[in-house]
Swiss-Prot record:
Source superkingdom: Bacteria
Lineage summary: Bacteria, Pseudomonadati, Pseudomonadota, Alphaproteobacteria, Hyphomicrobiales
NCBIfam families documented for this protein: PRK00132.1
One Gene Ontology term of the molecular function aspect: structural constituent of ribosome
A Gene Ontology BP annotation from the UniProt entry: translation
Residue stretches of biased makeup (Polar residues): 1-21
Name by which UniProt lists this protein: Small ribosomal subunit protein uS9
Signal peptide: none
Pfam families per record: Ribosomal_S9
Gene: rpsI
InterPro entries: Ribosomal_Su5_D2-typ_SF (IPR020568), Ribosomal_uS9 (IPR000754), Ribosomal_uS9_bac/plastid (IPR023035), Ribosomal_uS9_CS (IPR020574), Ribsml_uS5_D2-typ_fold_subgr (IPR014721)
GO cellular component: cytosolic small ribosomal subunit
Region (Disordered): 1-25
Keywords of the record: Ribonucleoprotein, Ribosomal protein
Family: Belongs to the universal ribosomal protein uS9 family.
Amino acid sequence: MATLQSLADLNRANTQTSNPENEAPVHVQKLDAQGRAYATGKRKDAVARVWIKPGNGTVVVNGRAVETYFARPVLRMILRQPLEIVGRVDQYDITVTVKGGGLSGQAGAVRHGLSKALTYYEPELRSPLKREGFLTRDPRVVERKKYGRKKARRSFQFSKR
């Protein structure tokens, strides 16, 4: 490395090595050895690990079919949302391991993980999924119970006399 004699030399060296800030980051395909894209999704206390690969639309959640694990149609609709937005319904086989939380939180975690896995498999899908908000982790969690109160915010009944 050349020695720097002045502040101008330092500025010149910094501008040559750093990337311009206006360039968009390049997203590349991330696949494992079996050709699957892997991502984790989170929602409330639930954590979902999602693997996708090209296939005919089979969805397996914790070793069970999605219809038996998520019996309520609303939960299955939440899972399908990312695929419907990008028009890739029945084009990927999806394997999911999910734990923690309740069924609603688990469905949200699977949706988050599936959206991330889709962007790892097809980086050009990032902008429509980000526009719909599927790549953003929902930060809302249950507020803790405080001492001196009945619940997180509810106080004990107050008696004036």
